[in-house]
Amino acid sequence: NGFSHQNPGFIDDILRRQSNFSNVYFPSDGNVTLVCLEEMLSSVRQINALVAGKTLEPRWLSTELARQQVSEGLMIWDFASDENPDIVMAACGDYPTKETMAAIDIIKTECPAAKIRCVNVSSLTTMGLGTLRNVATQKKFDEIFTHDKPVIFNFHGYPQTLKSILFNYDVHSHRFDIRGYKEIGSTTTPFDMHVRN
């Protein structure tokens, strides 16, 4: 629905605060959403926001994997990944995840030899990727995103918001191509908004 429904300004406001009391959850599917809600409702002394669509989306993870995803905040999706990747494709959010999985499928069809790692990020804080209880360390960040491979990151927010969070890590910015919301478009579908942006 364009700017009125897809404006990520609230996400930006939370994640740009200099604080250590807020989490923003970006569940990739219904199972992850349920686990996120469980985490949010059991937490105290922190602000939690959940960013999720209102339509039925693919179910990517079992309940067990959803719990692991939410606990760690980011995870390599082995079922959509290859060993020793040439490129890392990351997603944060339900629609961005669906789009990233479709992109991987297209690449695998057109270029079967391409080795891709699929990474999903389900939560962010001002301090980094993950939750307040489990912010990804530099070591974990490097293990997941590699030291030198290019990363295409599909984000459900302003690209600059994610760039400011990545600043917490020793990252060469030329490796990361962050795709997100740019306020271009009108009342339309999420896919069309992403194409326009």
Label each PLM-derived region with a short phrase:
Residues 1, 25-28:
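Active-site nucleophile and cofactor-binding loops and adjacent substrate-binding regions
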Residues 1-12, 19, 36, 40-197:
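Thiamine diphosphate
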Residues 21-23:
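Inter-helical turn/loop segments and adjacent helix faces that build the functional surface
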Residues 28-32, 95:
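Short beta->alpha linker loops
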